[in-house]
């Protein structure tokens, strides 16, 4: 539920790289009082996690880019949708500056809204939450945590971690490692022993992290 009292949801693209039809590759919202549905943002291939900044109330979301270009391109991304009607490029442009080899011909990435940050190629960002608790240090307040599920179609695997992201009022991004250690052998099979999926803040300020590889929920707390 957004700060405007409307329920937001993502409808992903129906394939790796296709021309989306009505409401596909978008974030939409529905007014529970009237049942009216409207598209809020387009050009979003597949957003699994989104949340609103506690101070600015801007919508932030993660996005999965297309596969099968190469190991390093394109990056999965983090976006800020500060207003209705923004278009983030799919299927014509990825990561703000990479025209799609198939659909990008004759189009410019300058036509679309750029991401706030590139997160890494095939890194699979899933759940994300802004932190509003008081257990962690004060400089964690209003930061977001993003669960990186990790790559599967990349020769050298990456991700499999949780990162902390600080953003300012203009949307500038700083990213820091928070929970690491799941990735043990980037070229191994399997390369990891855990895969973060989502993050959730508890009433006491602790953080829960789910791991669908082991079927475990971890609780992360802080003490001075």
Predicted region positions:
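Beta-sheet entry/capping signal
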Residues: 6, 58-59, 206, 216
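Hydrophobic, small-residue-rich alpha-helical packing segments that form membrane-like cores
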Residues: 1-7, 29
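Loop/turn residues immediately N-terminal
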Residues: 66, 214-215
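Glycine-rich beta-to-alpha transition loops that act as phosphate-gripper elements at the mouths
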Residues: 41-43
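Beta-propeller domain segments
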Residues: 13-18, 22, 28-35, 45-46, ...
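C-terminal substrate/ligand-recognition segments
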Residues: 200-213
């Amino acid at each position: 539920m957004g700060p405007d009292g409307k329920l937001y949801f993502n409808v992903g693209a129906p394939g790796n790289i296709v021309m989306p039809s009505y409401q596909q590759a978008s974030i939409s919202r529905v007014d529970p009082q009237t049942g009216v549905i409207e598209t809020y943002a387009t050009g979003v291939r597949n957003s699994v996690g989104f949340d609103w900044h506690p101070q600015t109330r801007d919508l932030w979301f993660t996005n999965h880019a297309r596969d099968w270009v190469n190991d390093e391109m394109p990056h999965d991304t983090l976006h800020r949708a500060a207003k209705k009607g923004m278009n983030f490029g799919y299927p014509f442009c990825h990561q703000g500056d990479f025209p799609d080899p198939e659909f990008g011909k004759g189009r410019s990435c300058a036509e679309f809204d750029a991401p706030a940050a590139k997160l890494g190629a095939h890194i699979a960002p899933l759940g994300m939450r802004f932190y509003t608790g008081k257990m962690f240090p004060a400089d964690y307040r209003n930061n977001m945590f993003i669960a990186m599920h990790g790559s599967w179609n990349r020769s050298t695997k990456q991700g499999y971690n949780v990162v902390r992201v600080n953003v300012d009022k203009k949307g500038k991004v700083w990213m820091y490692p928070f929970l690491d250690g799941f990735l043990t052998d980037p070229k191994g099979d399997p390369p990891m022993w855990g895969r973060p999926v989502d993050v959730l803040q508890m009433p006491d300020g602790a953080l829960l992290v789910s791991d669908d590889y082991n079927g475990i929920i971890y609780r992360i707390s802080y003490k001075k």
